[in-house]
């Protein structure tokens, strides 16, 4: 017997007759009152709900005047409208503050907005005024600040757009001319200046300034950040400071942490995501600042996804949320920036999907999905080449190189997981090793040939770490049958020369330098280590790699 189809066609819901016509089983014209009830001068009621029946009967149960008739119909209409409200209405974002605010509005109490209360606190509290003045006294001269702000915009806004340079430059000019600038804007501008001070290269006027004073750019950056934190941790400021401004501040700092810090957690990214998701979900706002907030949220998602793709860190933001929000990015007047972020979003979404699939699929399931991801990535690469390869401009050239670096990194991540499992479990294991080796070679050559460009835009340290890890992948592939090109080790020599030139302090960079020494003489006896490398002479290649890349953040939420 054939079962009934579950997908039944929905019947058209017909208007029902009034209650009296239904009882009498006669035809009803379904008006109010219907013709039959009107003719018999009886009350006409419809059984939509009992409350509506009572409301409709009430005016007919007492003498009707013009006043009572109009008021009764108005009351009936109002109460019926209330009953017809959608039953699927959802709560908004509810916390203690919104509950108190709603209660106050119900009682007729007019509450002042946090910005006016913050303004009053800054004007009346001498301690807060002094802290803010101390921050302004610490910044460099105005011409140096203007140059640093331009350095920030030229370096960071090319990749992640968080702070509007033209608006920030105007506010800095107002500060210079002693015009009033609100504290939130001052703190964001000074934060951007502090981040710019942490970069490696500066224009000549900034270099001259620091050669004439008794502190370095890094020391000044640390001092500014410390004073900003002290100011924001004041109880009144912490309570009244707008969450969107706090999110912007941590997002600005997170950009720098992503590029310069390797073995420590990006706590500013953690703060920004925590505030954006839990304290004040900016992607749910529908006010006039929605578009600006959405741009900040998308930039935070990009930073989070870049850390996952470039460093194989567990992402904070779920990849499907980021993918859904990408379509809400506005094109605006800068078409090149829109195209860049659109292509970057496609690459990062694919990279996040690969990361999730590696950790949730079986080996065979993931092998079967490789061709799908390869075709996705190939389509994105074709778009990158068509839209960025033949356009002049240093910013555009950097974006082209950056997109290709992310592309080859995502492709490397697609294959590199297979070197952790037995070759007997993987169909076509030699082919996968071959693809992994070729992809890693392409990525290494690209980074090696683009060192100057990456340094100009503040990405050199991150790329040096990435290429060092890629060298390890190539070495493993060579042990499993991949023939490394004879001229490839010139690439390692080029990277090693860059490290020797920069002389970055710290044990991590010393160990990376040691690894590169081994790479450049991979077919010869292990070279003797210089005195600068101390206790590294008794450690083999993989022990050193363990020291460099063995870290675990465990993703704790910071104390808020």
From Swiss-Prot:
It comes from Schizosaccharomyces pombe (strain 972 / ATCC 24843) (Fission yeast). Residues 18-44 bind DNA. CDD domains: GAL4 (cd00067). Residues 60-80 are annotated as: Disordered. Keywords: DNA-binding, Membrane, Metal-binding, Nucleus, Transcription, Transcription regulation, Transmembrane, Transmembrane helix, Zinc. This is Uncharacterized transcriptional regulatory protein C16G5.17. GO terms for biological process: regulation of transcription by RNA polymerase II. Its main location: nucleus. It comes from the Eukaryota. The chain crosses the membrane at residues 182-202. Residues 64-80 have a biased composition (Basic and acidic residues).
